[in-house]
């Protein structure tokens, strides 16, 4: 006789639920999005790579509609390989339908950046090379002509007269002590890669800075970027050029001109947005043919030029501005008709004098008058 036995299956023990990653494990990070080879990194400490940077996969960049230069606030978990959630982009929680900088219409600068302060330097610039929102300007400077002082005066004037503008100072290949001086003397964003850092850092810093400026401009902000210097940025790209391409005089690789040209060309006044003003220094009379060629390449791309004179600086005449060689294209858009007529009359009067005599006369008269308006009235009465 066969006895059938049935074995009752024991119910499988329920697998304990996986521990849920609670919000207690989330960390909030904030920084600028830098995209390299389709992979993004949130730079949490400035513009250069750091140990606490957060990796953002390309899929998440597309998912959230992020762009290089965005200031992102997000949550993440260690080991910082992806984001958990994006909370805001450039201070906004509604960023997906924003306009694209490349699709916006550039127009001539129409709104003037008033630079006049107690400083004679800013008053001279305001008279002879007026700057508008969206200007693309070159500050052409030989060594020891006072370009750093000019930049500091420009930064101080913009901060004081236009606190609504977002000021960015980009220093490429500068001395560390000058970076410190700039950070302590201005109220604005300072992004710096000192001369002892590799060329790759110089170019990465500049690229992220201009993308940051574009994101602000397309959002309706007025941005002013002071770059020191366009020449050193061009040198860095030239050193990183792969070689084998067309080489210009002075050992300048033709391919190395495109990235700094793209940086400088980003300056524009946007019809339906904000504006991006770029004032960049260009070094001349350095004894390097490469520097001269870099300047010649950018000479015709700007719409404003302020030229400094080594001869005037050697005589301790500051600001060492070459008045005849400095000026702004389409300045009549920025100036009212009477002011435009008086500045032309002033130019003709000073143009008949030697450069040293003209600058001394101008600066003396400016110090005697409380404002440029009062000075121009004096010009009207005496010429």
Swiss-Prot record:
Pfam families named in the record: ATP-synt_ab, Rho_RNA_bind
Positions contributing to ATP binding: 132-137, 144-149, 175
SMART domains xref list: AAA (SM00382)
EC number: 3.6.4.-
Biased composition (Basic residues): 8-17
Record bears the keyword Zinc-finger: no
Matches recorded under CDD domains: rho_factor_C (cd01128)
GO biological process: DNA-templated transcription termination
Superkingdom of this protein's organism: Bacteria
Keyword set, alphabetical order: ATP-binding, Helicase, Hydrolase, Nucleotide-binding, RNA-binding, Transcription, Transcription regulation, Transcription termination
Residues annotated as domain Rho RNA-BD: 26-93
Region (Disordered) residue spans: 1-22
Keyword Transcription regulation part of the UniProt annotation: yes
Family: Belongs to the Rho family.
Quaternary organization: Homohexamer. The homohexamer assembles into an open ring structure.
PANTHER family (UniProt xref): TRANSCRIPTION TERMINATION FACTOR RHO (PTHR46425:SF1)
Function statement: Facilitates transcription termination by a mechanism that involves Rho binding to the nascent RNA, activation of Rho's RNA-dependent ATPase activity, and release of the mRNA from the DNA template.
Protein's name according to its UniProt entry: Transcription termination factor Rho
Species of provenance: Streptosporangium roseum (strain ATCC 12428 / DSM 43021 / JCM 3005 / KCTC 9067 / NCIMB 10171 / NRRL 2505 / NI 9100)
């Amino acid at each position: 006789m066969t006895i059938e036995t049935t074995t009752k299956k024991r119910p499988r023990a329920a697998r304990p639920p996986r521990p849920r990653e609670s919000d207690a494990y989330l960390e909030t990070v904030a920084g600028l999005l830098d995209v390299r080879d389709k992979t993004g990194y949130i730079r949490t400490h400035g513009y250069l790579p750091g140990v606490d940077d957060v990796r953002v996969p390309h899929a998440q960049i597309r998912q959230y509609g992020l762009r290089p230069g965005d200031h992102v606030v997000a949550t993440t978990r260690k080991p910082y390989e992806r984001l958990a959630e994006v909370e805001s982009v450039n201070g906004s929680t509604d960023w997906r339908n924003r306009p694209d900088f490349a699709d916006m219409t550039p127009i001539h600068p129409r709104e003037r950046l008033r630079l006049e302060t107690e400083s004679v330097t800013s008053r001279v610039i305001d008279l002879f090379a007026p700057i508008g929102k969206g200007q693309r300007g070159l500050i052409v400077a030989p060594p020891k002509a006072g370009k750093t002082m000019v930049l500091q005066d420009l930064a101080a004037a913009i901060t004081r007269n236009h606190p609504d503008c977002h000021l960015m100072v980009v220093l490429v290949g500068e001395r560390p002590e000058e970076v410190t001086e700039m950070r302590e003397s201005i109220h604005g964003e300072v992004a710096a890669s000192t001369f002892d850092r590799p060329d790759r850092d110089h170019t990465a810093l500049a690229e992220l800075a201009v993308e940051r400026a574009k994101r602000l401009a397309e959002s309706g902000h007025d941005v002013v970027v002071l770059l020191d210097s366009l020449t050193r940025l061009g040198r860095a790209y030239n050193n990183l050029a792969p070689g084998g391409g067309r080489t210009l005089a002075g050992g300048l690789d033709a391919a190395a001109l495109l990235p700094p040209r793209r940086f400088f060309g980003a300056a524009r006044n946007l019809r339906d947005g904000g504006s991006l003003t770029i004032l960049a220094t260009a070094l001349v009379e350095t004894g390097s043919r490469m520097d001269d060629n870099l300047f010649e390449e950018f000479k015709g791309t700007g719409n404003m030029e302020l030229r400094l004179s080594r001869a005037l600086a050697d005589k301790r005449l500051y600001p060492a501005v070459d008045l005849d060689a400095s000026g702004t294209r389409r300045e009549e858009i920025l100036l009212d008709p009477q002011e435009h007529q008086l500045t032309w009359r002033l130019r003709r009067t000073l143009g008949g004098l030697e450069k040293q005599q003209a600058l001394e006369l101008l600066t003396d008269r400016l110090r005697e008058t409380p404002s440029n308006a009062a000075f121009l009235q004096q010009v009207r009465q005496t010429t």
